[in-house]
């Protein structure tokens, strides 16, 4: 971790830190995997993503965020990690035209038996159609045979309110972490 950063749990955090640091709070919530239901949508289907989908996945990620930009090389590097599981990289495909309109990427930590949702993206023009919910629930169903539980984290102040999506899919908890960056 860079010397100008600190990560504090909510229990350790106080407003005093804000004199010298900027704060970006993140939620971290979990799912027991006991009750997971598929979200079936007539117009969209889920498929396992393959390495040749990476350029399209990168476009979806970059088109979904104003402040994040990833490259194909960065995403390919994820496939070389110990927690990479090919079955946990999925895409939402429009049935009528075959267009990839969303994607989901998750990891599996075999030591902890934990499924970790890393990315859920839906192109802005396709949001509000339950595609995100379909992707999250599909990942949870795929994790269920291998994991004891699943986790996800995200920015508390994200304008797209990802925490609401995850809670609709059965995630619970109230863990908040603060990423503090030294003011210059």
Each model region followed by its residue ranges:
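Acyl-donor-binding surface of acyltransferase catalytic domains
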Residues: 1-42, 178-182
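Short glycine/proline-centered loop/turn elements that form peptide/ligand docking sites
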Residues: 136, 158-162, 181-183
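Hydrophobic adenine-recognition pocket in adenosine-nucleotide-binding enzymes
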Residues: 49, 120-122, 155-156
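Conserved acetyl-CoA-binding loop-helix of GNAT-fold acetyltransferases
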Residues: 122, 128-144, 163-168
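A conserved beta-strand-loop-helix scaffold within acyl/acetyltransferase catalytic domains
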Residues: 67-122
């Amino acid at each position: 971790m860079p010397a100008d950063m600190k990560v504090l749990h909510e229990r350790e955090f106080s407003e005093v830190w804000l004199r010298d640091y900027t704060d970006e709070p993140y939620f971290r919530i979990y799912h027991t995997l006991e009750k997971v239901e598929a979200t079936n949508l007539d117009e969209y289907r889920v498929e396992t993503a393959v390495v040749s989908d990476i350029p399209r996945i990168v476009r979806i990620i970059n088109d979904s965020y104003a402040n994040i930009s990833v490259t194909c090389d960065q995403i390919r590097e994820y496939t070389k990690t110990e927690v990479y599981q090919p079955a946990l990289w999925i895409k939402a495909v429009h049935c009528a035209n075959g267009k990839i309109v969303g994607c989901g990427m998750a990891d599996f930590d075999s030591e902890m038996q934990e499924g970790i949702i890393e990315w859920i993206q839906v192109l802005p023009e396709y949001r509000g159609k339950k595609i995100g919910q379909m992707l999250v629930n599909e990942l949870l169903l795929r994790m269920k045979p291998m994991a004891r539980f699943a986790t996800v984290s995200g920015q508390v102040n994200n304008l797209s309110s990802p925490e609401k999506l995850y809670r609709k899919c059965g995630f619970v908890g109230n863990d908040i972490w603060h990423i503090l960056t030294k003011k210059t």
